[in-house]
Amino acid sequence: PSDVVARIVADGMSKHLGQTMVIENVGGAGGTLGSGRVASAEADGYTLLAGSMGSHVAAPVLTPNVRYDSERDFIPIGITADAPAVIVARKDFPANNMKEFVAYVKANGDKVKQAHGGVGSSSHMACL
């Protein structure tokens, strides 16, 4: 969702500032690749990051080789969106609600696979 939110915010900022905001979506590693790029960019006043709790709180703890320090390299400006996490499965999955899902995972954890945006991403944390 960071890319979508960034584009919506950039559109409003462009109108307000009277200049184009360019969005460069750097995907991969739960947002840590883009965060690392912004952390090492020249401090020009024009480079901003649409990050997440995953890339700035969870990933640095779970991934020892991130190329930035969230507290040292960034300053929070504001919250732009609140995106709830959802868990979905194939229609033929043997659980129809969260209670059944939790019971199934407890009994069959080795059979359950998850898809997420990277270690430490909000979708990864929601699946834990």
Predicted feature residues:
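Extracytoplasmic "Venus flytrap"
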Residues: 1-8, 27-29, 115-122
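Short, polar/charged alpha-helical segment
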Residues: 2-18, 127-128
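Active-site signature of alpha/beta-hydrolase-fold catalytic machinery across serine-
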Residues: 8, 36-37
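Hinge/capping helix and adjacent helix->loop/strand transition within the periplasmic-binding protein
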Residues: 13, 40-45, 61-128
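Early extracytoplasmic/lumenal segment of secretory-pathway proteins
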Residues: 20-36
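Active-site-proximal beta-strand/loop segments in catalytic clefts of secreted hydrolases
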Residues: 25-27, 51-52, 90, 117
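Adenylate-forming
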Residues: 32-35, 56-61, 124
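Paired acidic/hydrophobic, glycine-rich loop segments that form the ligand-binding mouth/hinge
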Residues: 45-51
